[in-house]
């Protein structure tokens, strides 16, 4: 499923960043959802919780911005904008 792959990629990137910096866990992340990503904020949160289970990102608080501009060149993408780490 396209949505699952997008969310899984974000979880991988978040966890990779946490591991590379020696963080104990991820406390939060800011994510931007393109208008054509086929994800609502609620749907993204649900998938993130499932994909992040048993990872350093489990329980991370998500701040999600949803674009409404289908003409945006990144409208089909999900962008990880920032990550909060507990080091």
Model-derived segments and their meaning:
Residues 1-87:
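N-terminal, polar/charged subdomain of small-to-medium soluble alpha/beta proteins
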């Amino acid at each position: 499923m396209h949505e699952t792959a997008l969310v899984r990629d974000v979880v991988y990137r978040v966890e990779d960043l946490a591991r590379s910096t020696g963080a104990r866990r991820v406390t939060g992340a800011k994510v931007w959802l393109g208008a054509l990503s086929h994800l609502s904020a609620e749907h993204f949160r649900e998938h993130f919780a499932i994909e992040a289970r048993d990872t350093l990102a489990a329980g991370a608080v998500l701040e999600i911005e949803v674009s409404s501009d289908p003409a945006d060149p990144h409208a089909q993408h999900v962008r990880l904008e920032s990550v909060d780490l507990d080091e």
